[in-house]
Structures are given as structure tokens and as C-alpha cells.
Amino acid sequence: TTHSEVSAASVAVPTVSHLEVARALMKAGVDVLIEKPLTTSLAEADELVATAARTKRVAQAGHLERFNPAVRATLPLITQPMFFEIHRLSVFTPRSLDVDVVLDLMIHDLDVVLSFVNSPLRDIRAVGLPILSDKVDIANVRLEFESGCVANLTASRVSTERVRKLRFFQPKQYISLDYGRQDVIVFSV
């Protein structure tokens, strides 16, 4: 197959190779969907974005949770989010150890929360620790928004069970979203 026959490609290689592979494809005239995380560093991400602009190609990060039916069903329910509690826990496996747990797992929840809260960030507090690898394996982030909304996110790849839940509160309402089961439970008063 020649590049002229390929209009788009999915880049699903180890993160350390994302920039090299995506750059070569874009220079060959191919749009790219890149599995998350986009790259291993901000400098590489900037270079990838610049390459896309220079070659006039589309480079899209594969933040697939935004297309999860539960996330899509929840978006219209959000009126005045006040507090989020998000847990994404995974049993340890040797995959994706080239990046920390924030870029491997939490990035999905950051993407979703930022799409749910229509307010600039005021403060970010974070802590993370390497437990079973030389990268951060467990992390907690607290996002505070100008609107007063707060989001607490925990991601871990050191767990005995898989948990992928987002819970949030707004006036007279509690909403629980399970990414894995793709369901939403709404409690209203």
C-alpha cells in the first residue's frame, strides 16, 4: 500500500515511539489518531502539534472515554457541578510502564472533568509515588476551578481490583457514572 492510498492511521505503539511514528505519517500526508498519551513530554507534544500544523494534517489524541455512552449521557445532566470524586484503579501489569499513571490512566478523567466543568482552573495540587516501577504508580490530583467546583482524582495501577468511577454533586443531585459498565445513576431531591 502506498501512502497516497492511506488517508488516516491509528498510532498504537509504545508511547516513546508516538512522536517518531506520527511525524513520519504526517510528513507522508497521513492524518493520525494517536493513542493516549499523545507523547511522553510536553516538548514532544509541542513538536507533534507543530508538525501537524506544518504538514496541514490532523493529529488527534485518542481520549476515548469522551465517547463512552455513559459520559455522553451525563453531559446534558450537568447544570452546576460542585464536587467530583473520581477513581481509576487497575491491577498492576507490566504494560505502559514507559509513562506514569497520570499519562497512562488519569489522563482520561482529566479530559472528562475539563469537558464537564465550564470554568477556568484556579489551583492544582498533586501528589504521586512510584510503588512497583520507576514511574509514578499512584497519584492524587485536586483541581479547584474559578466557579468553586472541586475535583479529586485518584489513579492507581497498584490495586487488587479494577475501578473506573466518576461521582459528582450539584445542587439537589448526585450522579454516579461507571465507565466500565457504561451506566449512570442519578439521585435527585
Can you annotate each of these PLM segments?
Residues A28-V30, T55-V58, C149:
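A short helix->loop->beta-strand "cap" motif at the edges of active sites that frequently abuts
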Residues I34, A59-A61, L177:
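Hydrophobic residues in well-ordered beta-strands that form the structural core
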Residues G62-P69, F92-D123:
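Mid-domain beta-loop-alpha active-site segment that forms a flexible
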Residues L110-D183:
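Contiguous beta-strand/loop segments that form the cofactor/metal-binding neighborhood of enzyme cores
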Residues V16, T39-S96:
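A contiguous active-site-proximal alpha/beta segment in oxidoreductase catalytic domains
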Residues T1-V49:
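Beta-loop-alpha module in the N-terminal Rossmann-like domain of NAD(P)-dependent dehydrogenases
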